[in-house]
Amino acid sequence: MATIKEIKEFLVTVKELESPIFLELEKDNRSGVQKEISKRKRAIQAELDENLRLESMLSYEKELYKQGLTLIVGIDEVGRGPLAGPVVAAAVILPKNCKIKGLNDSKKIPKKKHLEIFQAVQDQALSIGIGIIDNQVIDQVNIYEATKLAMQEAISQLSPQPEHLLIDAMKLDLPISQTSIIKGDANSLSIAAASIVAKVTRDELMKEYDQQFPGYDFATNAGYGTAKHLEGLTKLGVTPIHRTSFEPVKSLVLGKKES
């Protein structure tokens, strides 16, 4: 008779809930065996559910595949709201019907999984472009226009160039057909891929800035207006990476000029 450990190792090879192997093993009344059967069935169901979720996030891409298009780029940005640091956009072309387990809107991915999924996107993508627009340009042209500039910069880095753009709630002045999707990072795998690339890229930049400008907690808050960040602003003042067109940074700068 096989040991429970041997059965556990064997069950990993079972890929279907309807497998006759389950029926056979269910005759074994050892509680440990029954526990492993239930555990494996849950794992198979979770894999099926994940596959369905990923399939549903390819609906926009599949419509474009039907039109004969394959070089479809997802575009997203991170960093429109922070008080400090750049806005970062990413453009990602995935292979046709590519599915990356766990890929989702970066806000829905557990932080501990960010680097793993970022690496999976890097490994599988046909091309990746990254656009970074700093705080000085943001202050000059406004955050909306700066976001568009970051997206255009990211697209310009792609090789091959895309046949169609899938963009998260934006439209770009480019001679390429495009689809603007509300909550695109939750509804398109291509945009979700861009979302995690932009997120990890910007987070790493803000960790570097945290070394240059200690006291604002940039490594943790990524430039957003948390209590620690605001405390740093009050005690230490404005850094060269702060957005002086954003409040309360703007008032701090004006107050300093007036005093």
UniProtKB/Swiss-Prot annotation:
Cofactors (names): Mn(2+); Mg(2+)
Family: Belongs to the RNase HII family.
A single MF term (Gene Ontology): RNA binding
GO terms of biological process kind: DNA replication, removal of RNA primer; mismatch repair
Catalytic activity reported: Endonucleolytic cleavage to 5'-phosphomonoester
Keywords: Cytoplasm, Endonuclease, Hydrolase, Manganese, Metal-binding, Nuclease
Sequence positions that bind a divalent metal cation: D76, E77, D168
Gene Ontology CC: cytoplasm; ribonuclease H2 complex
Xref: HAMAP family: RNase_HII_B
InterPro entries xrefs: RNase_HII, RNase_HII/HIII, RNase_HII/HIII_dom, RNaseH-like_sf, RNaseH_sf
RNase H type-2 domain sequence ranges: 70-258
Broad class of where this protein is predominantly found: cytoplasm
The protein's enzyme class: hydrolase
Keyword Cytoplasm tagged: yes
CDD domains: RNase_HII_bacteria_HII_like
Official protein name in the record: Ribonuclease HII
Function: Endonuclease that specifically degrades the RNA of RNA-DNA hybrids.
E.C. numbers: 3.1.26.4
Free-text cofactor note: Manganese or magnesium. Binds 1 divalent metal ion per monomer in the absence of substrate. May bind a second metal ion after substrate binding.
Localization per Swiss-Prot or TrEMBL: Cytoplasm
